[in-house]
């Protein structure tokens, strides 16, 4: 639907989400990163701006859903579990299924390859899938996911969040690269 995302916090990851939306085909979006960097918030805002129907599961908060996903012996049973716990009708071509805290059910990551091949729904997975936790995934379906790693705010994002304009950011970065002091009042504003 290409709506403008109305988020309070401008993040560079949004550009990567939009690129996935524009070209994803048979690929899920897998958003990873440390805890508390804004993954869930940013994904949720993006999806609600882009899709008519958003189904969201939190595998930490929803133990019954996690148990159902864990009990699924194949992709058909996993999809039936998704459908049963969705809480609303799944509309092919208009629904995105967002599975948050996916590190709690590694089989969902492995099964995503088969879910996206069905081509009826879009899938977004999110979680703190760092190093050790990824080792528990039997097979990361590399060709079937677009991985976006999120990090804490970088300098530019921090400036955006504090209302600093792009021209001021560019000048500040130029001063840094040229190893010259930032104009006094601007320096004070940035502090």
Stretches found by the model and what they are:
Residues 1-191:
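Phosphate-binding site recognition
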